[in-house]
Amino acid sequence: MSEPAGDVRQNPCGSKACRRLFGPVDSEQLSRDCDALMAGCIQEARERWNFDFVTETPLEGDFAWERVRGLGLPKLYLPTGPRRGRDELGGGRRPGTSPALLQGTAEEDHVDLSLSCTLVPRSGEQAEGSPGGPGDSQGRKRRQTSMTDFYHSKRRLIFSKRKP
């Protein structure tokens, strides 16, 4: 079942498997479709939440938006450095934090999200398994669960008419 030497196809993507099932991709049409879909989603969210997510301003409507004090953004989310506000992909502008939202935040409002981890060696007494300790169940193997562990098995009763 080998193909003849003249019918060998060249893989256009090199060694990777690559198929175009529906023809070439029109990138301009794709970007227009994505932009239209995004605009529709933004408009739907704007009408639902009475908030303009593009300019980050509240709108008149069912909801009354107010600033929550003391919940400032962590430093992780604030833009820093010479590439401030630049997208890593393509160099376009990415949405930054609005000055209206950051107004009134101070250094003490930021939450410190740093964590530290230290390894603690086990002592010989705990490794042997003290009663009630975490090493108590290490020696036993767990059996594999089956369907009957979750559902009780029942016998099906079949009533048939007896012949006279």
UniProtKB/Swiss-Prot annotation:
UniProt-listed Gene3D superfamilies: p27
Zinc finger (C4-type) stretch: 13-41
Coiled-coil stretches noted in the UniProt entry, renumbered to this chain: none
Sorted UniProt keywords: Acetylation, Cell cycle, Cytoplasm, Metal-binding, Nucleus, Phosphoprotein, Protein kinase inhibitor, Ubl conjugation, Zinc, Zinc-finger
UniProt keyword Zinc present: yes
Main location: cytoplasm
GO biological process: cellular response to amino acid starvation; cellular response to cell-matrix adhesion; cellular response to gamma radiation; cellular response to ionizing radiation; cellular response to UV-B; cellular senescence; DNA damage response; DNA damage response, signal transduction by p53 class mediator
PTM (free text): Phosphorylation of Thr-145 by Akt or of Ser-146 by PKC impairs binding to PCNA. Phosphorylation at Ser-114 by GSK3-beta enhances ubiquitination by the DCX(DTL) complex. Phosphorylation of Thr-145 by PIM2 enhances CDKN1A stability and inhibits cell proliferation. Phosphorylation of Thr-145 by PIM1 results in the relocation of CDKN1A to the cytoplasm and enhanced CDKN1A protein stability. UV radiation-induced phosphorylation at Thr-80 by LKB1 and at Ser-146 by NUAK1 leads to its degradation. Ubiquitinated by MKRN1; leading to polyubiquitination and 26S proteasome-dependent degradation. Ubiquitinated by the DCX(DTL) complex, also named CRL4(CDT2) complex, leading to its degradation during S phase or following UV irradiation. Ubiquitination by the DCX(DTL) complex is essential to control replication licensing and is PCNA-dependent: interacts with PCNA via its PIP-box, while the presence of the containing the 'K+4' motif in the PIP box, recruit the DCX(DTL) complex, leading to its degradation. Ubiquitination at Ser-2 leads to degradation by the proteasome pathway.
Pfam families for this protein: CDI
Impact after mutating residue 146 to D: Reduces interaction with PCNA
Required for binding cyclins: region residues: 17-24
Residue numbers carrying Phosphothreonine: 80, 145
MF terms (GO), sorted A to Z: cyclin binding; cyclin-dependent protein kinase activating kinase activity; cyclin-dependent protein serine/threonine kinase inhibitor activity; molecular function activator activity; molecular function inhibitor activity; protein kinase binding; protein kinase inhibitor activity; protein sequestering activity
Region of interest (Interaction with TRIM39), ranges: 152-164
Known tissue expression: Expressed in all adult tissues, with 5-fold lower levels observed in the brain.
Location of the protein in the cell: Cytoplasm; Nucleus
Ranges for region Required for binding CDKs: 53-58
Motif (PIP-box K+4 motif): 140-164
Cross-linked sites for Glycyl serine ester (Ser-Gly) (interchain with G-Cter in ubiquitin): 2
Domain comment in the entry: The PIP-box K+4 motif mediates both the interaction with PCNA and the recruitment of the DCX(DTL) complex: while the PIP-box interacts with PCNA, the presence of the K+4 submotif, recruits the DCX(DTL) complex, leading to its ubiquitination. The C-terminal is required for nuclear localization of the cyclin D-CDK4 complex.
Subunit: Interacts with HDAC1; the interaction is prevented by competitive binding of C10orf90/FATS to HDAC1 facilitating acetylation and protein stabilization of CDKN1A/p21. Interacts with MKRN1. Interacts with PSMA3. Interacts with PCNA. Component of the ternary complex, cyclin D-CDK4-CDKN1A. Interacts (via its N-terminal domain) with CDK4; the interaction promotes the assembly of the cyclin D-CDK4 complex, its nuclear translocation and promotes the cyclin D-dependent enzyme activity of CDK4.
UniProt function note: Plays an important role in controlling cell cycle progression and DNA damage-induced G2 arrest. Involved in p53/TP53 mediated inhibition of cellular proliferation in response to DNA damage. Also involved in p53-independent DNA damage-induced G2 arrest mediated by CREB3L1 in astrocytes and osteoblasts. Binds to and inhibits cyclin-dependent kinase activity, preventing phosphorylation of critical cyclin-dependent kinase substrates and blocking cell cycle progression. Functions in the nuclear localization and assembly of cyclin D-CDK4 complex and promotes its kinase activity towards RB1.
Protein name (Swiss-Prot/TrEMBL): Cyclin-dependent kinase inhibitor 1
Chain's gene name: CDKN1A
